[in-house]
Regions:
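Short, charged interaction patches at domain edges and termini
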Residues: 1-8, 44-54, 94-126
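A common structural junction motif
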Residues: 77-86
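Secondary-structure transition/hinge residues
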Residues: 13, 17, 84, 121-125
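Extracytoplasmic
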Residues: 36, 54-56
């Protein structure tokens, strides 16, 4: 499921532009950011009942410019959050924002907007 989420983020031209991404570098990284303006993420499973899995996606929108970090965060929300009965795709049934916050790292002069998304995913136990 993580690959499907990453594909949605990487395929969006508006997010691509905000991140200053290029063909060789999407500026979307696992665990730690590697560019001044980027997204870093962590992914983990929370619960499973054999029918549905809940997973947590932690997203960090990072930029020296707070307004840009906020724009990146808002675009990620637009791309991922499911409204009403809308599913993200056939397997990802629901995506909801479940907390977050912002901080400023003095040493690197970077603003970080952190968001926790909860994904409800169809599970196929065989």
């Amino acid at each position: 499921m993580l690959n499907e989420i990453l594909n949605i983020l990487k395929a969006d031209s508006e997010l691509y532009s905000l991140l200053g991404a290029n063909v060789k570098d999407s500026h979307i990284y696992m665990n730690n950011g590697k560019a001044d303006t980027c997204i870093s993420y962590k992914y983990s499973s929370i619960t499973s009942d054999g029918i549905k899995v809940q997973s947590k996606l932690e997203i960090n929108c990072i930029s020296p410019d707070y307004a840009k970090a906020e724009s990146i965060f808002n675009r990620v929300k637009q791309l991922l959050i499911t409204v009403g009965n809308r599913q993200l795709n056939n397997d990802i049934l629901n995506v909801a924002l479940n907390g977050g916050g912002s901080l400023y790292i003095e040493e690197t002069k970077q603003h970080i907007i952190k968001a926790y998304f909860i994904l409800t995913i169809r599970e196929r136990m065989i």
